[in-house]
Amino acid sequence: YFWIKPKVTEQNMKHKIIKQTLLTIGISLSIVNSQLSIAQRSLGVSGLLNIPSADMQEDGTFMTGGNYLPQEMLPREWGYNSGNYFVNLTFLPFMEVAYRCTLLKVKSTGKWNQDRSVSLRLRPLKEGKWWPSVVIGSNDLLTTGELNPFLDSGGNRYFSSVYAVGTKHFGFYGHDIGVTVGGHVPFRSRSENKGVFGGVSYRPAFLKPLEVMAEYDSKVVNVGVSARLFDHFSLYAYCYDFKTVAGGLRYELTPRPRAFRSDEVRMPWDGRVELVLYPQITLNNSWLDKIYGAVINIAPAVEARLWKGAAFTGQVILPVWNNMVGQMDYIRAGVLTLSQEFGLPGGAFGRVTVGNFTNSRMGADLKLRYATPDDRWLFGLEGGVTGSSTFYEGKWQVSNWKRVSGAAEVRFRERRFNMDFNLGVHRYVYGDYGVRVDCIRHFGRTTAGLYAMYTGGEANS
């Protein structure tokens, strides 16, 4: 046999890197387990490599991770390599929601910031013996200041798409082959995602954690491989258009369900005094010169039950680290409140609280609640009068209690999926009125929720 050494070119070097990457993943399979994993890896949602599929994660699955994205696969606004990170939750067996941030340079400063987007997937048809599963989904559908997803104007929506996709799996001798076919709905002319897409995945019977995939994403052909590591981690890499390599890593967790417990706790009189240590981590993406404003605090608190229905909380906030300016640099008061519960006719009850609250407010608050005997329905009224409570330049500064706020709320409890549905009409601190809807689900020791609100002519979610 004769072997001729090829000329070393940039293209050959890219192919060499691709082969080395895939080989590394192959070697790492000695530490994987047998649990399966599915996701549209590049966007942090369920699917193949760069296309969605109609597969869904197990109910309650939480995923978080990050991806390396070469400039060849990014929209035209990116002229450089970038990446994204995401959180994803299978909120219901047929519903998946993801929040994603893609790193983006600000043209005016050259500093890194991020583009934020949301993905939503709904499965109207689950896979059966003779038919495929079907999913209808969207990526980056809405944008700031524009609620009409069909308009080209307003916002960025770099990754916008609406699609319908079907997936069918075929098994033989323990092997699994998945076939996916779908198409993008042409809902706006400036969308980067158009046309038909499809792909094939293969899981060998002798190595279930390994998945090999090939796809056409409506523009180019991609080939890649993924592997499940240590029960909770997934690593993947793929060749985009046979020109460059993309890849990523994510963590997955499926918590156990738990039974409901009342969210309105009636405080007994037992004289208990507790010292509780609260870690505080805050991330805020509101600046063009940094990716996040970050705050890390330790906030110890004394919590005491005084007499029947009465409670006291005294908290101090100790700053650990932050990249902000203002009161975040100072040791300051946290929650300092005294509350008293009282019973009302018909099984209703109330609570009045006075003191220093969160969100830099100080004042008085009154809550009235009534729950049906089976705890399925809860009705509530709330009102308060507050002023500002801030700590600048080493001084605690408070204002007069002039701001009036309030709310009327109703909650319905759905027991099959351990869910609460809340509807509230609110008057906010600065006098604006709004409506808010919350959908909350309880997983194990974790509670997750989705909300939508409308106030002042603007909507948020």
Describe every region a protein language model picked out:
Residues 41-43, 232-236, 240-277, 390, ...:
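Flexible, glycine-rich linker and terminal segments associated
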Residues 39-162, 170-171, 175, 204-210, ...:
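Transmembrane beta-barrel domains of Gram-negative outer membranes and organellar outer membranes
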Residues 60-62, 83-85, 116-120, 160-164, ...:
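Hydrophobic, lipid-facing positions within transmembrane beta-strands of outer-membrane proteins
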Residues 1-43, 254-266:
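Cleavable N-terminal export/targeting peptides
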Residues 66-68, 99-101, 134-140, 179-185, ...:
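Transmembrane beta-barrel strands of outer-membrane/channel proteins
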Residues 153-217, 312, 344-347, 359, ...:
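Detector for outer-membrane/organellar transmembrane beta-barrel domains
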Residues 143-144, 172, 222, 358, ...:
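Short beta-strands and strand-coil junctions in structured, solvent-facing domains, enriched
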Residues 254-303, 308-361, 365-402, 407-411, ...:
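Gram-negative and organellar
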